[in-house]
Amino acid sequence: MNQSHFFAHLSRLKLISRWPLMRNVRTENVSEHSLQVAFVAHALAVIKNRKFEGNLNTERIALLAMYHDASEVLTGDMPTPIKYYNAQIAHEYKKIEKIAQQKLIEMLPEELQQDYRMLLDDSYTSEEERAIVKQADALCAYLKCLEELSAGNAEFTLAKARLEKTLQLRHSSEMDYFMTVFVPSFSLSLDEISQDSPL
């Protein structure tokens, strides 16, 4: 049986810092970001199903979100202003991501490749699934801005404003629910979020 380097590569996502051009109070890596996006995407899917007549596979959504940035272990995390500077750069970067996704899939034993292709290759996801994961990704970036601003880091002021516009463009009922019910807590201190539920 041949060895596979797939999970050894994925373990290196923790070495890739996000927001590399910004001063951060606390550095965030791609691995922890992916887990937070999985939490939020799963929540959005549950909210959509329970409150807004959705019919999403919530576990699949969580897995898609968990792997949504996996290709960055080969490409690195390109800053958003560069990645989307114009349509041509965005298109070319998508092609690079696709190549990286395929390279990751090919690292797996052949008998496992199709299972992971369903998670890593965008062409196997529905428009609705992609939309939920993108909403969660944008929400998590927004939450990072709130955390940095709460810690006194004004560096994230413009990023927050840009992300507010992105969230308006990706607007949905489930996102509104999440923003109303869960997001305000991210601007509070540990004492403030703990006072209602002491151990």
From Swiss-Prot:
A molecular function (GO) term: 5'-deoxynucleotidase activity
Gene3D superfamilies reported for this sequence: Hypothetical protein af1432 (1.10.3210.10)
Sites marked Appears to be important in orienting the phosphate for catalysis: 18
Required co-factors: a divalent metal cation
UniProt EC number: 3.1.3.89
Pfam families: YfbR-like (PF12917)
Positions of the HD domain: 30-142
Known catalytic reactions: a 2'-deoxyribonucleoside 5'-phosphate + H2O = a 2'-deoxyribonucleoside + phosphate
GO cellular component: cytoplasm
Main location: cytoplasm
Residues binding a divalent metal cation, per UniProt: 33, 68-69, 137
Compartment list: Cytoplasm
Source superkingdom: Bacteria
Residues the record lists as binding substrate: 18-19, 33, 69, 77-80, 137
Keywords assigned by UniProt, alphabetized: Cytoplasm, Hydrolase, Metal-binding, Nucleotide-binding
Oligomer and partners: Homodimer.
NCBIfam families: PRK03826.1
Annotated function: Catalyzes the strictly specific dephosphorylation of 2'-deoxyribonucleoside 5'-monophosphates.
Similarity comment: Belongs to the 5DNU family.
Name by which UniProt lists this protein: 5'-deoxynucleotidase ECA3034
Lineage summary: Bacteria, Pseudomonadati, Pseudomonadota, Gammaproteobacteria, Enterobacterales
